[in-house]
Amino acid sequence: MVGRGSGLAAWDEAVAEWGSRNATSWSTSVLDRVTDLGGTGYLAVAVTFVASYDLIRHRNPNVVLFLFVVLAGVVLTNNGLKWLVDRERPPVRHLVATSGSSFPSGHSAAAAATSFAIALVVARDWSRRGRAVAAGVAALIAVAVAASRALLGVHWLTDVVAGTAVGWGWFLLSALVFGGRLQRLGDPAARAGAARRGTP
């Protein structure tokens, strides 16, 4: 069990109770839509779309493998941690259906890892400012999903913080492993054009 009472954990009960107590049908609907962004089904569709588009454009399977390793790996890692910790969910009204152990948050982990992986792939040929914007959007998605899980009463605050950390950690590990392969990728047509012009 993960204890509560000091540091960040001291906010666990307060956040869970505040979210449940102040919920409205409108806020619950909005938070439910946000939390869907961290669902495995939604992320699998997003990863498949981005991977397919990138494969058609760049013709290199390394990015496809990277994206699926990030998603599958973070889900397996997080489920393993859930099994080890086996923490109960907050004893408040759950505003959406849920099951299984609470720590760490699977939606938070999956959103954190996969949103950054997609941003890295989509924006790798963009300008520095464009890549920064993509990273900012990915971070916003991760934080929004994490907040939604806590405010919907299905996770403690420490669950979503830990889940986000797991997700970002798995993304960084995957990016390091695939880093050389990803950096060598580029638009084949653009590379051919540069070669004809005699530019590197």
Predicted features along the sequence, with ranges:
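N-terminal transmembrane-helix/juxtamembrane module of multi-pass inner/ER membrane proteins
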Residues: 1-42, 83-95, 199-200
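Alpha-helical transmembrane segments of multi-pass membrane proteins, especially transporters
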Residues: 17, 66-71, 137, 160-164
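Membrane-helix interfacial "entry" motifs
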Residues: 25-32, 55, 59, 63, ...
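Membrane-helix interface segments
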Residues: 26-27, 59-64, 91, 128-133
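Hydrophobic alpha-helical transmembrane segments in multi-pass membrane proteins
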Residues: 43-44, 75-79, 111
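Interfacial segments of alpha-helical transmembrane regions
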Residues: 47-74
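Membrane-embedded catalytic cores of phosphoryl/pyrophosphoryl-handling enzymes
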Residues: 49-50, 94-200
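Small-polar-interrupted transmembrane alpha-helices in polytopic inner-membrane proteins
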Residues: 68-87, 134-147
